[in-house]
Amino acid sequence: MASVAFLGLGVMGYPMAAHLKNKGGHEVTVYNRTRATAEKWVAQHGGKLAPTPADAAAGQDFVFSCVGNDDDLRSVTTGPQGAFATMKKGAVYIDNTTASAEVARELDEKAKAAGFSFLDAPVSGGQAGAENGVLTVMVGGEEEAFEKARPVIDAFARMIGLMGPAGSGQLTKMINQITIAGLIQGLAEGIHFGKKAGLDIEKVVEVISKGAAGSWQMENRHKTMNAGKYDYGFAIDWMRKDLGICLDEANRNGASLPVTALVDQFYKDVQAMGGRRWDTSALLARLER
């Protein structure tokens, strides 16, 4: 059993922290910007509530965070009352935020200078994956810290991979989002085409999902897409944040991402339709408007 802090109890962090407490059996202290959410978590799962990230992190073996973006991450780590000020030497900070590789490298350097380790460890699997404890975790950082943290991360994961040095976890998550963007647009166009052709979409998917076109998105989203229901997953506002990170990194490393850039604009169109909180499969709604 380890002593653990978790910073950020959103739709992902709330169940992830719960798995660390209930499945992992760890002592968990939580911090959330909206205190009422942390109070609810403690009432539901036990553990302790801390008023600041610094208070949460003090003396802990492992500190996790799952927050909104680079600025939020800097705030809970190196900002006023940030966790880095109180972390003990030899501890490991594991960040599950989808953020830039740049901020991951920056925080890795600051952690090393202070005598503890930093792992960038974004996740894939959405809210359902977090609730069921079956997330995929893509990790960047030192192997020693990874092996130390892996048994703890395992409480909410089904796949944990060390992808390389600091920033590599975030870069891998970018590839994940780039791939998903193209897959969903292709699926949306396929369903749209099938409807226009007068085909039974259920029968079509039953057949093509067993061939080369099959994907997680097809298996898990075609029914809701066909029914015009878009409240079953990752919100478009967050997907556009992620794709913005991908496109910024591509500008830095010289990668050409024409489809990703186009799909990002398609998501912008869906936002303008009032779909900011619709899930990513709502690309079909744009085609059917």
Name these PLM-found stretches:
Residues 12, 16, 66, 87, ...:
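Methionine-biased hydrophobic packing positions in alpha-helices, especially
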Residues 16-20, 107, 152, 193:
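Hydrophobic residues within alpha-helices
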Residues 28, 49, 117-119, 160, ...:
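Hydrophobic beta-strand scaffold residues
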Residues 167-289:
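Helical "substrate-binding/catalytic lid" subdomain
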Residues 4, 67, 93, 98-178:
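Rossmann-fold dinucleotide-binding core
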Residues 1-65, 91, 96-97, 127:
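NAD(P)+-binding Rossmann beta1-loop-alpha1 motif at the extreme N-terminus of oxidoreductases
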Residues 53-116:
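Rossmann-fold NAD(P) dinucleotide-binding segment
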